[in-house]
Amino acid sequence: MKVLIKGAGDLASGIACRLHHCGMDVVMTEIGIPTTVRRTVAFSPAIYEGIAEVEGIEGVRCDSLEEMVIAVAERKIPVLEDPECQLAMEWRPDVVVDAIIAKKNLGTTIRDAKIVIGVGPGFTAGADCHCVVETKRGHDLGRVLWKGSAVPNTGVPGMIGGYAKERIIRASGDGIFKGMCRIGDLVEKGQLVGMAGENPIYADRSLLMFQLLFCSYIMM
């Protein structure tokens, strides 16, 4: 079975790994500068590094249908810079999974494939997809909805270690992001962790950096 996954962030990559292990052929699409923050567990870095590995599965950047077909035959996961899915749809997937996690539908329709699945808020089962997967933390996480929609985006991050929105470090201004630390680093309160253009970004508490944008992302 041929499965196209829109998005190659951490949630999309978890889906891709599971389907790949089940023997399905998986292709993923991304934008030119991915917004993934949990980059060590995602296939999106293949867009700018050429290759990304998650749980022993190799994701490779592909720029043509021919490269994509070869990668699939080698049991790799092709990652395409194809935001509109024009190239990917030429592959004629049996299943389309929209796992962009944009909190809204960016153009997926129920006619895109025999089976269309929406992941997270912004989709309505039976209208723009066949089913929706709940992504909100809690008892319904991962539940498949055959009617209605996932819980709307609250704008508040899930609670981890007693912190919700407090665990997010935000830029103080616009500009191209440059990280000054790495995922896995222990940072202290007041430490410089990045720059948004000429605007410094400081940690407002001591923490473990477990998610971080790729350098060159434009902060606005």
Task: Report residues per predicted region.
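Well-ordered secondary-structure scaffolds
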Residues: 1-220
